[in-house]
Amino acid sequence: MIARLAGRIILLNGWRRALAAFLSGAFATLTQPPFDIFVAGFVSFPVLVWLIDGAIARTDAGPLRRLLLAAKVGWWFGFGYFVSGLWWIGTALLVDADQFAWALPLAVLGLPAFLALFYAFAAMIARLLWSDGLGRILAFAFGFALAEWLRTFIFTGFPWNLIGYAAMPVPLLMQSVAVIGLVGMSALAVFVFAAPALLTGGHFARTGIGLAIFLALAHVGFGAWTLSRAPAIVDENGPLAVRIVQPSIAQAMKWDNAERRAIFDKLVGLTEEAPAEGKPRPDVIVWPETAIPYILESTPQALAHIGDALQEGQVLLAGAVREEKGADGGEPRYYNSIYTIDDRGRIVSTADKVHLVPFGEYLPFESFLRGLGLQEVVEMPGGFTAGTTRHALAVKDGRSFLPLICYEAIFPDELGYEGAGASAIINVTNDAWYGDTPGPYQHFRQAQVRAVEQGLPLIRAANNGLSAIVDTYGRITGSLALDAVGVVDSYLPSPRDPFWGRPPGWIQTVLILLTLLAASVGLILYSRRRFH
């Protein structure tokens, strides 16, 4: 039955092959949040393998033509995957549809079309190393792992919905990322998902199926072993109590001058709210990204109001736009920042967002694109300016938090050595742009995995959710649902040392890629000697 199905898929040609690849990619989206149907990967990836088998089997095409046919299959798979997984980005443009609706096709179709090029590249690389049976599955895993790694930094990077997340729907299955990293998880996921393609036979097919089963069991077993040694989820004697404020301000209200006071009062009111019975008095209070609707340096009354709201010894970490006056009356610069404010209403420190969102917070190639009207996409005059370095924010009692603002949390190993000595990751964000769509759930999952990857607990304050405190095993110690209004009160979990310490992330990635490459090439050479 499987052989018959595979044969039919392999024989598809032209638009039928493209449609099958597109639908297979779209089906693979079910492996990502909020669906987390990881078994969908065992359908979509074998189909992709068979489609590439069909492209390679063309006897009427030369080597270059077959390579391009494989790339075309990969592109259609990627286009289906990214269209179905990222369509919600377009909802941000509908908040002010009169001004931004024109850009909807670029967001919903243009971005997926560009990102699909990475999967076209993955298919091309796999084709270069393709061999019968197990060899093509290894080549497949290598090609996709390499493409996913490139997606983390090419053109500033956009590693959203990396395939590795499909293998980590729950904390039990997140623990391996601390050992092999997110690129390693992507390679593992692709290899295991694609392994059913070996049920049709081929060189070392049984070995490949056995290896996939072993890797899957090792992945689960390592997670179970790690969690069995983990401390209690909530430490009732924790050294630091944290409150996250989630105001759920509608995006249309955020920059309405008439609503600024109401927004600010809502934040202050939630800050002053007494803890529920059994919950600790907070030492640190966190507001979401750009929560403060004022420029603090020029609004001393707002700082005074914050100081009055904080109890003795409390510290507020709040997202706000920071203005830096231009020299000699020049244009000011604006930063997306986190402020640390003490109980006297004094600004203790600030941290600026380093990794800005292209076309959302700044305009790449501005001089070239200004004539196209894209400058209007950026809210602040001239857009945001990127911070120069990421540094820890001193909080209290010698503890410090590493700031990740908004989508900085999607980048694996974004912290690097800077995480050394920090007590936690603080991630402030505003996902109200995207409403009740898959976007906020996908964003949260990626931040959740950062806690496991870096060995640091996560404090995540989101304007409309999902706000949560996550321990270093990926377990949620307190949270608020999407669009809820309220606070999360919980003790801060303890950090733990990352599995490999804190070497540069690329070292781990390169070792994994070289291992896969060596295995693929070695299997090709061995097969040629034995079977030819």
Swiss-Prot record:
This is Apolipoprotein N-acyltransferase. Signal peptide: none annotated. The active site is at residues 289, 353, 406. Its EC number is 2.3.1.269. It is found in: Cell inner membrane. Pathway: Protein modification; lipoprotein biosynthesis (N-acyl transfer). The chain crosses the membrane at residues 37-57, 75-95, 106-126, 128-148, 179-199, 207-227, 505-525. Belongs to the CN hydrolase family. Apolipoprotein N-acyltransferase subfamily. Keywords: Acyltransferase, Cell inner membrane, Cell membrane, Membrane, Transferase, Transmembrane, Transmembrane helix. Residues 245-494 form the CN hydrolase domain. Catalyzes the phospholipid dependent N-acylation of the N-terminal cysteine of apolipoprotein, the last step in lipoprotein maturation.
